[in-house]
């Protein structure tokens, strides 16, 4: 179950390794109204599907020409790296954002969180 308190639409990766933006109903950001009630929705993840949550600072990351990173570019990099381990998946997205913004200072946070449902990643443990 979930609700949306002003968040960006997550990206869902499916077991067939396609991906798309999740069709989510937008609502007010948390804290705007003290007595606002957020509707609750349900979603069932199939084993092997995943989700990427991100802040608006990702798609609104600007370069020196003041061009945004965009949702379309985010979806492209996700599609190219969807087979990666979640840790590497996030690193590749961050590298692509960095290549877009270069040294241009950002005024917003860049936060990404991903998970894969029902998959195990057997990686060596760090010592």
PLM regions: where:
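Conserved subregion of the PPM/PP2C metallophosphatase catalytic domain
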Residues: 1-127
């Amino acid at each position: 179950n979930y609700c949306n308190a002003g968040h960006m639409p997550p990206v869902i990766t499916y077991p067939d390794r396609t991906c798309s933006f999740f069709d989510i109903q937008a609502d007010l950001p948390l804290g705007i109204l003290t007595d606002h009630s957020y509707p609750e929705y349900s979603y069932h993840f199939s084993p092997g599907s995943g989700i990427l949550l991100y802040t608006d600072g990702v798609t609104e990351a600007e370069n020196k020409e003041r061009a945004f990173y965009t949702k379309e570019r985010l979806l492209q990099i996700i599609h190219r790296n969807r087979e990666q381990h979640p840790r590497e998946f996030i690193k590749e997205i961050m590298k692509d954002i960095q290549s877009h913004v270069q040294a241009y200072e950002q005024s917003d946070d860049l936060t990404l969180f991903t998970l894969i449902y029902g998959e195990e990643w057997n990686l060596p443990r760090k010592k």
